[in-house]
């Protein structure tokens, strides 16, 4: 069945390029284009599209205002089209909070060539969006003094324990939901979320303002500390390494792995090699199979692994593949998972195991 797409963008060039890219796919069809949200409102009623692509910054009505109204009145899958700027990344993070499924970045130079290089990725994101489960967003407020789940036992966790997280489509909100429930003395956390360079810094800043723990973009060489989360930068793979008795972050700008840089498989494999039984793996919502092989390696090295269940995923791709490959010990909803991870830690942290 053909997926019907409506393009909303004030740039005639972007409307033309997206139409060409989308219509080249046998299962996708552009049913209309609109230069602004006001025209788009009528077209949505007429054309009944399956997926919208929406420019982040537009005249007449702001893309975020339109998205907020759309999600309140007529929820549907939306893929944001964003500029590779700090402002663009911050607006895109807000769009994900409002309910957008995913986003595509416009190249800074040579837009036509750049967009065509992204054509397969754009098509994949639209397909995933058409199947996405739209999840009602709750308004978020920064965490106050005692928020976060309580730790069982005191002190619960030695600095040897680690939580290793991978996610893709829908992952920005899933990671936020997970981290907001982490107490300030939880183990160190390493995260790979598929996201372009520049956006990971905005993502880390937003999480840092909302969470009880400290959240930062990994720079490489940091000692991994309890109560801290380190997010892979969009330009490099993030790895876990050892430095004497300590765990440290390591960056690698080598080629994509499993079609991605940063890659979840790279992070998970490094955790298998360097943390073994001290690691807890978490695979969240996402398209594709990045992370499935790495999670199996973690399990074989003695880690205990959690996967997000289908009902709470925006896209049940990466968790499904990890479960099918046999690397998952516990499948749970996004709401339940932080508590289950902390329960597991409480039951298994009498003493961290040296590897």
Curated annotation (Swiss-Prot):
Modified residues (4-aspartylphosphate): 55
A GO CC annotation given for this chain: cytoplasm
UniProt cross-references to InterPro entries, sorted A to Z: CheB-like (IPR008248), CheB_C (IPR035909), CheY-like_superfamily (IPR011006), Sig_transdc_resp-reg_Me-estase (IPR000673), Sig_transdc_resp-reg_receiver (IPR001789)
S-S bonds: none
GO molecular-function term, one example from the UniProt record: phosphorelay response regulator activity
One example of a Gene Ontology biological process annotation: chemotaxis
Catalytic residues as annotated in Swiss-Prot or TrEMBL: 168, 194, 290
Subcellular location: Cytoplasm
The enzyme's E.C. designation: 3.1.1.61, 3.5.1.44
A Pfam family annotated for this UniProt entry: CheB_methylest
Keyword rRNA-binding: no
PANTHER family, alphabetized: PROTEIN-GLUTAMATE METHYLESTERASE/PROTEIN-GLUTAMINE GLUTAMINASE, PROTEIN-GLUTAMATE METHYLESTERASE_PROTEIN-GLUTAMINE GLUTAMINASE
NCBIfam families in alphabetical order: PRK00742.1 (NF001965), PRK12555.1 (NF009206)
Similarity comment: family membership: Belongs to the CheB family.
Function recorded in the entry: Involved in chemotaxis. Part of a chemotaxis signal transduction system that modulates chemotaxis in response to various stimuli. Catalyzes the demethylation of specific methylglutamate residues introduced into the chemoreceptors (methyl-accepting chemotaxis proteins or MCP) by CheR. Also mediates the irreversible deamidation of specific glutamine residues to glutamic acid.
Name of the protein described by the UniProt record: Protein-glutamate methylesterase/protein-glutamine glutaminase
Organism name: Methylobacillus flagellatus (strain ATCC 51484 / DSM 6875 / VKM B-1610 / KT)
Gene label: cheB
